[in-house]
Structures are given as C-alpha cells and as structure tokens.
C-alpha cells in the first residue's frame, strides 16, 4: 500500500506519556503502537477505535490466523480495540552443563514443581569448601511465575476483587518461598547465572535471543551449554506462562478509518511484514503461519547459530498455551503494589497468613476506590 501523504513516526523514549499528551491535544496518530500496560487505559478512556466493524466485515481478514491468546490481548470488555503486532512468550533457560555435571537428566516440557524443587535442592551447594554456597538452583523465579503455572488468577475479570488469599495463589507463594529458602534467600544476580553457577533462569524469548547472539556466544558466553523449556507446573495448574503482546490500534479521532485499517492490516496481518519481526525485532509473530514457517526458522538459526527445530515447536506450544493478564484500568497499580510487598511476605517466617490477608484487603480497597 503506497500513500504519498502518509506520515510514519518512530517510538519515543517516554512513549506512553507522549501518546497521552497527543490524545489530550486531539492530535493522535491515526495508527499507533499500544504497550501491554497501556491497553486497558487507552481502551477505557476512548483513545482507541472499535475495530469490530472492520474485523467482522473485511472478508480478507480472519482472526483465526492469529494465536488466540495474542488476538484476545487486543480485546477489552468483549470489543476488539487493537491487533497484535509482536508477541513475547516466557520460557525457562536451563544450564545443561551444570545438570550434566550433577548427573541430572534434562527435564522435559511437562515437568512439575516437585521436579523443579528436587533439582534446585540437589544442585545448591558449596563446591569449593569455603563454607559459602556458590552453586544454585534458580535465578529470578518469581511468585507470579508460580502463580500462573498453578492456575492462579490474581484478580477477578472486572478488576474489583483480589484473589491473593485463594488456595492456588497461596500455594504458589509458599512454593516460591520454599525455592528461595534452598539458597538461604541469597540475592543472586544475572552474573551468577552467566558464570555457569545456576541451573535455571526464567526469561522472555526476546531476552533469550539477545542472550545468545551468534557468533558472540562462543567467546562471550563462557563454556556451558544451555537450552530452553516450559516453566514447571504446579499441582493445580499446567506448564503455562504469560505472553506479552505489543499491540497496534487506530485512533478514535481518525478521519481516515478505512485507510488506517488497511495500514494496520499491513503491519499486523500481512505475512511479508510479519516475517520481518524475526529479522529486525526480538519477539515472534502472533500469526500462526508466520511463526511456524521455514523462513522464520531459518532467520532464527542464522542469528543464533544452531538448529531451531525443537525450539520452534516449543514456541508454538507456548503461544497456544498463553495466559493473558486481566484487563482493567488499575491492574498495573494493583499488581505493582502486591509485587512490592512480596519480599516481606516471602521472608517473614511468622505472619504469612495475616500478611496475605492484610495485603488482599488493601488491594481490594484500591480496586474499589
């Protein structure tokens, strides 16, 4: 599609604030990127155009071409306000060399919390006899990773109630505490993992791609081999993780709705454009046919210097089992409040139940202000 009078802009450092100011001045771009954390707000305040009339009438458009979770990321209260442009699933990076040294079999994609705990317990040790632990099970495994893989839903759909005291979430937090206790709540860093002293690390696929650039990995990333698998499942859940989606929408102020829709499709729906996600960005395409294509695999193999057949299957599994965060205006504020209090909850040995209940009540109050 060629339009001589079409202006194309670039992302700003303070993009969300810049876009909000544009909206206040009535000067929004016709088509713009929507960050995951902004989508609920932008939808609820009327910045984004309702796309239902286009998605349902345009015979050249089929929502079934998208991974369901990615397409649904652009839905707010039953209405489509955006299309997914790029998806970023989370996976578990595994230090295969360390596991081999400890005579531990590489876990499969359907491993459990119990498997995870036993491996972490076995590898955590003082290897040089100086009285300090120097080898560990996991870096950066968070309470929310455990919550998502244990079927926990942090909030109700309408965003009026926090489920922090529900059994799946309490058990997820207790499991995270149990995992951290193995390493005596040591404040580990990414350098510890990079040095080959940690078995596992949850990581987004975009981080994974930049972590393994070829040929730099040979001389930059030490002498351990690694692989990636799905995160372990809890007793009440499955091997599921969150998938973040960069979205694109149309301004509700646009006077060029049809042209904007064609441009939006070109960016988010056209195969040729979406193939470039693998070349020029670090995520993957939300279109099933593109992510499962030979072209995508070849691009990844060239950039990462290894056979990607198994990892392409893993990406497809992750995308088909994506978990979406709830969409309501105060989600980010409520989540950040919970996350900031979690260190205290994880390290306080005495007051777990009362701390959880108190925080739940505070969040419920925040949600209903």
Where are these predicted regions, by residue range?
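Paired acidic/hydrophobic, glycine-rich loop segments that form the ligand-binding mouth/hinge
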Residues: 30-33, 199-204, 209-211, 222
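Glycine-centered hinge/linker elements that transmit conformational signals in sensory
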Residues: 119-120, 158-187, 231
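Early extracytoplasmic/lumenal segment of secretory-pathway proteins
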Residues: 1-36
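Hinge/lid segment of periplasmic solute-binding proteins
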Residues: 11, 34-89, 223-232
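Short, solvent-exposed loop/beta-turn-alpha elements that line the ligand-binding surface or hinge
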Residues: 52-66, 108-109, 127-136, 152-171, ...
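Extracytoplasmic/periplasmic solute-binding protein
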Residues: 76-85, 90, 114-162, 198-200
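Mature extracytoplasmic/periplasmic domains
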Residues: 216, 246-332
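C-terminal capping/gating helix-and-loop segments adjacent to ligand/active sites or protein-protein/ligand interfaces
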Residues: 242, 302-367
């Amino acid at each position: 599609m060629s339009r001589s009078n079409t202006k194309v802009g670039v992302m700003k450092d303070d993009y969300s604030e810049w876009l909000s100011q544009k909206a206040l001045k009535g000067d929004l771009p016709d088509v713009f990127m929507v960050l995951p954390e902004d989508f609920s707000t932008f939808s609820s305040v009327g910045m984004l155009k309702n796309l239902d009339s286009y998605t349902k009438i345009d015979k050249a458009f089929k929502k079934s071409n998208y991974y369901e979770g990615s397409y649904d990321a652009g839905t707010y209260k039953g209405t489509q306000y955006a299309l997914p442009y790029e998806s970023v699933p989370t996976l578990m990076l595994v230090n295969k060399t360390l596991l081999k040294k400890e005579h531990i079999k590489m876990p499969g994609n359907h491993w459990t919390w119990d498997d995870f705990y036993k491996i972490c317990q076995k590898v955590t040790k003082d290897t040089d006899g100086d009285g300090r632990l120097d080898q560990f099970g996991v870096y950066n495994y968070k309470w929310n990773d455990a919550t998502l893989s244990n079927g926990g839903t942090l909030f109700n759909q309408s965003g009026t109630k926090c489920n922090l005291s529900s059994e799946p979430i309490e058990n997820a937090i207790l499991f995270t505490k149990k995992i951290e206790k193995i390493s005596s709540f040591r404040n580990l860093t990414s350098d510890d993992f990079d040095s080959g002293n940690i078995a596992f690390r949850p990581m987004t696929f975009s981080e994974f791609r930049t972590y393994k650039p070829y040929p730099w990995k040979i001389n930059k990333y030490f002498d351990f081999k690694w692989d990636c698998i799905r995160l372990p499942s809890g007793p009440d859940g499955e091997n599921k993780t969150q998938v973040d989606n960069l979205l694109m929408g149309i301004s509700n102020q646009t006077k060029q709705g049809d042209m904007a829709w064609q441009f939006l499709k070109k960016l988010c729906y056209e195969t040729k454009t979406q193939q470039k996600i693998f070349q020029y960005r670090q995520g993957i395409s939300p279109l099933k046919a593109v992510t499962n294509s030979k072209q995508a695999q070849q691009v990844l193999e060239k950039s990462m210097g290894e056979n990607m057949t198994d990892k392409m299957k893993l990406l497809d599994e992750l995308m088909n089992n994506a978990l979406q965060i709830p969409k309501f205006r105060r989600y980010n504020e409520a989540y950040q409040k919970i996350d900031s209090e979690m260190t205290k909850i994880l390290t306080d040995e005495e007051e777990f139940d009362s701390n959880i209940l108190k925080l739940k009540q505070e969040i419920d109050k925040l949600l209903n202000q």
